[in-house]
Amino acid sequence: ANILSYEMIIAVIGDSSCSPEETKLAETVGELLAQQGVTVICGGLGGVMEAVCRGAKSKGGLTVGILPGQDSSMANSWVDIPVVTGIGEARNVPVVKSAQAVIAIGGGYGTLSEIAYALKSRIPIIGLNTWSLSRNEREDDSIIRVQSATEAVDKAISLAKRHKNYEIASLRSQ
């Protein structure tokens, strides 16, 4: 039933403290990604990260948490693979760079830094109730804005399929 057999990795980013609406969005995104056989990668802690992992696990998905500290027990209960880094917020770089697409849900300045890393690395970024950018007073539409969890996941998967990291992963598994 897992269409993509976990080769595709999509990062879901957002705040460690989030609204009930963002929690529900993240959980639904996790469920939908797992149903498509996508590996979910995130910062491994609470809030949006916990909700997306909980959603993914409820549908039998695979979750990876890139942790800021030295201790794997800091990971939320729904992380399958906790990656201990000891590098604090610098862990935002591998969260994003490991993925073929990124879904941002809400978020504070940590999420904004991840959005910037994704844009700089040409990794497609889909936004649900998240930051908007402007440059010289002009709207910068680099973040692909969507209105629902379903739209976010559909868009992320279709863009991830065209990303160079995914093409390499699919070749390796043949």
Annotate the PLM regions:
Residues 97, 101-102, 146-166:
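A charged, well-structured terminal subsegment
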Residues 82-86, 128, 143-152:
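Short acidic-hydrophobic, aromatic-tinged amphipathic segments that line or gate anion-handling sites
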Residues 1-4, 172-174:
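A cross-taxon signal for low-complexity, glycine/charged-rich
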Residues 137-142:
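Acidic, glycine-centered active-site loop in nucleotide-sugar glycosyltransferases
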